[in-house]
Amino acid sequence: MAARVAAVRAAAWLLLGAATGLTRGPAAAFTAARSDAGIRAMCSEIILRQEVLKDGFHRDLLIKVKFGESIEDLHTCRLLIKQDIPAGLYVDPYELASLRERNITEAVMVSENFDIEAPNYLSKESEVLIYARRDSQCIDCFQAFLPVHCRYHRPHSEDGEASIVVNNPDLLMFCDQEFPILKCWAHSEVAAPCALENEDICQWNKMKYKSVYKNVILQVPVGLTVHTSLVCSVTLLITILCSTLILVAVFKYGHFSL
């Protein structure tokens, strides 16, 4: 009997709580909706512009990010760019280390067992983290710089160029203090190093943005299969000629002791 009474009382408390929630729910939801609507009204888009500089096999990837004019607390924030490098390109980790020492860029490779000498068809995608810097010419802007290099591709039968697609990166932001406009852009949270020379892990906000270009396409010159016989013949001829000249020079000018 006592157990039945306790069950009835528990059910009554649950019904009372549900009724209270139904009574207060619409008002709270309306208040939250008004608050979100106010924040959305003052939202401005994040604009990302990604472009590739230079020609040939050695390029520079330049990423510029512009925030809205209404940002007052942007100086408390850091921007991290997570860039995927396609198999047709590679980033030299030793070059990145040299650029960090000279304070030119702050970037680090995430991928391990990375072979910079491998051709395109034996490579896989890699990942780079770039800590963007404030743009001195724009108050609400960040920019990042990354040198990339084209890998060798298989010869083509017709076209003498190969296309490499560089997709837009992920933008991650970490701020020392919260401010309402972050709700406009924050999509999810991602764990990443707080700084380049820091082993601490921070929870970065993955940001939504609008890109000027859908993606960047690089055209890389490649050989033609119709030239295979010619290239092999000339290479073999030059190799034999050079080897012969070296042997002649060794026997003519070399000093041998028995």
Swiss-Prot record:
Q: Which segments does the topology annotation call Lumenal?
A: 22-230
One GO location term (cellular component): endoplasmic reticulum membrane
Q: Which domain of life is it from?
A: Eukaryota
Which ranges does the record list as Cytoplasmic topological domains?
A: 252-258
Which Pfam family, just one, is annotated for this protein? PIG-X
Q: Which InterPro entries match?
A: PIG-X/PBN1, PIGX
List glycan-bearing residues. 103
One record GO biological process: GPI anchor biosynthetic process
Signal peptide interval? 1-21
User: Which key words are in the record?
Assistant: Endoplasmic reticulum, Glycoprotein, GPI-anchor biosynthesis, Membrane, Signal, Transmembrane, Transmembrane helix
Specify whether Membrane is a keyword of the entry.
Answer: yes
Q: How does it sit in the membrane?
A: Single-pass type I membrane protein
Where in the cell is the protein located?
Endoplasmic reticulum membrane
Keyword Zinc-finger, does the record have it? no
Q: Where are the transmembrane segments?
A: 231-251
Q: What is its main location?
A: endoplasmic reticulum
> Pathway involvement?
Glycolipid biosynthesis; glycosylphosphatidylinositol-anchor biosynthesis
Q: Which PANTHER family match?
A: PHOSPHATIDYLINOSITOL-GLYCAN BIOSYNTHESIS CLASS X PROTEIN (PTHR28650:SF1)
**UniProt family annotation:** Belongs to the PIGX family.
Summarizing the function annotation, the protein's role is: Stabilizing subunit of the glycosylphosphatidylinositol-mannosyltransferase I complex which catalyzes the transfer of the first mannose, via an alpha-1,4 bond from a dolichol-phosphate-mannose (Dol-P-Man) to the glucosaminyl acyl phosphatidylinositol (GlcN-(acyl)PI) intermediate to generate alpha-D-Man-(1->4)-alpha-D-GlcN-(1->6)-(1-radyl,2-acyl-sn-glycero-3-phospho)-2-acyl-inositol and participates in the sixth step of the glycosylphosphatidylinositol-anchor biosynthesis. Probably acts by stabilizing the mannosyltransferase PIGM.
- What does the record note on quaternary structure? Part of the glycosylphosphatidylinositol-mannosyltransferase I complex that is composed of PIGM and PIGX. Interacts with PIGM; PIGX stabilizes PIGM.
* Protein name per the record: GPI alpha-1,4-mannosyltransferase I, stabilizing subunit
